[in-house]
Structures are given as C-alpha cells and as structure tokens.
C-alpha cells in the first residue's frame, strides 16, 4: 500500500489509472484531503462504495499523530509534537503575525549536522522524512489548530538540503493548486550550507526563497559551532550564494546567531560586510536562545552596535523578534522528544 501524501499529482494520476480509475477521480480525492481535510476514503461520499473500497485496499492517508500541542501565552506561537507511523517523533511550529500563519516544518528525525547551539542535533539523527511526512505536517497543523497556513519555512528539525529529493518533491506539492496551493515565493528553505545543493536548488527552477544559517564569518569560529563547516568552508558557502543569485536573481536571507563574546564583536560585523559585498541580502540578527549553557546572549548594546555597523555599510538587517521562547519553539530549540 502507498501513502497518497507521498505522491505528486502526475504520480497519482498514473497510480489511479493503473487500478482502473479515471483522472478526474484524483481531483475528487485531492479535494477531500487538501481542501476539506477528510482523511478517510469511506467519508469521500462523491465516490462510489466500490471505489472507496478499492482505494482503501491500495492506499492509505498517513497523518502524524498529535502527542502534544503547546500554545505560547506571549504570542500564540504553537508547537506541535507529532508521532510518525514508525514511532519516531518530530516537532513543527505555527507562527502568527499580521493575520498570516507561517508553518515551520521538519525534514528529518533529528539532525546529523549537530550545531553546538541547536537542540535538535543533541538528540542524534535517525532518518530522513518521506515526502508525505513533510507535507502532512501542514495538513495536521491546519486540522489541529483550525487555521490556514499561508507561508512555509523549512526551518524545523533537520537539514533540508540533506534530504534534497524529498524536500524538492514536497515543495512541488505545497505549491500545487490542486493540493496546498501555497505560493512559491511564500516558501523558504533554510540551510546551514551545502554548497552543491544550494546551486542545485537554484537550478531546480522552483524559485523558492533561500535562508543561509551563517552564524560566523571565519572558518576558525564557524568550525567551533557548526561541525559541517570543516567540510564546507565559509568561502565555499559564499561562492554558492553568488552562483545562486546569478541563476535566480533572488535576494538571500542571512541568519546570524549572536553569541556573547564569541561572534558579536565589531570586527565580526566588519568581516560580515566584506563577505556579503556584491550580494543582495537581508540579515536576521538572532540573539542566541538558551540551549547550550556555555553560550550566552549578547548585551543589548552589543546587538545594536553590530546592527549599526551593518546598516552603515548598506546592509539591510533587523534584530529578530523571537516567538515562542516560553514553549521552547524559537530558533534552535526544537528537539526529538517523547511525552513522559
């Protein structure tokens, strides 16, 4: 049996025709799933009983099981703990701002990158998520929170570009008008930096937004907090961004976590200006969230000083207003966990 949520539109048409069902039946089923949020074939009443039985024998619709839902008392940010079919768990987040809802979704169970400041990698890496497990997070968020997701960021658990094929297919399904119908420019892929995959993303023609988690401006410092940097240097990352912009023309968001007396010095800001020269970028400055006790948030004056140096050199930036910190739903705080 196949999970319908793993299949793109053309694949579903082929699968349905293989079992003797017309193409328009695909549209009917997708309307039930993606528009009406009905996930049992038996309840799809514009299909005959015979067709419902046939579909139940050949396919299943796999939504993650909700284990826990926490809602921030500060800003309504909602964190979801899901159990997958094999018993593994992942987390997703819904962010609320200016009448819009952004879903922050996971792409892996755990994470192999193991950034020092991130909770996800501390629980180890298990496996990549399937296409359906990525897409179903949006459906499950909408179902359980009674909301409509308008923006999606691949910024939850895992490194999206290390699950490249499934992420690409899931983006196509999010954007498909017969499925979730989310505008392509409302989808952002956030990566710690896999240069060849950044270029491949540009060459895919999908035209999604890209965010690079840079966090340090020298290999010496980045090696200390992002082990993967020992394989892909800062220079290689910046080169891949230049290639990305040559191909797409899109502005790139640079994520920069600020850690007190580590990467928050004026010389770090000046080096960042030099690195980004000639690129069209927007820089998010993120005071580190409490995960690793050896790292501390910078002083407010250090934050403002860093921001001022960037702005004086023509780089648009902001100090990110963190959401969901009271429920551990902010940047770097998602982890693989079980309910006690």
UniProtKB/Swiss-Prot annotation:
Keyword Heme appears in the UniProt entry: no
Highest taxon in the source lineage: Bacteria
Localization per Swiss-Prot or TrEMBL: Cytoplasm
GO biological process annotation, one example: tRNA methylation
GO cellular component terms listed in the entry, alphabetical order: cytoplasm
Cofactor notes: Binds 1 [4Fe-4S] cluster. The cluster is coordinated with 3 cysteines and an exchangeable S-adenosyl-L-methionine.
Domain named Radical SAM core: residues: 97-326
EC numbers for this chain: 2.1.1.192
Pfam families: Radical_SAM (PF04055), RlmN_N (PF21016)
GO MF terms held by the record: 4 iron, 4 sulfur cluster binding; metal ion binding; rRNA (adenine(2503)-C2-)-methyltransferase activity; rRNA binding; tRNA (adenine(37)-C2)-methyltransferase activity; tRNA binding
Cited SUPFAM superfamilies: Radical SAM enzymes
Cofactor or coenzyme needed: [4Fe-4S] cluster
Keyword line: 4Fe-4S, Cytoplasm, Disulfide bond, Iron, Iron-sulfur, Metal-binding, Methyltransferase, rRNA processing, S-adenosyl-L-methionine, Transferase, tRNA processing
Additional observations: Reaction proceeds by a ping-pong mechanism involving intermediate methylation of a conserved cysteine residue.
Function: Specifically methylates position 2 of adenine 2503 in 23S rRNA and position 2 of adenine 37 in tRNAs.
Family: Belongs to the radical SAM superfamily. RlmN family.
Protein name: Probable dual-specificity RNA methyltransferase RlmN
Provenance organism: Thermosipho melanesiensis (strain DSM 12029 / CIP 104789 / BI429)
Gene behind this protein: rlmN
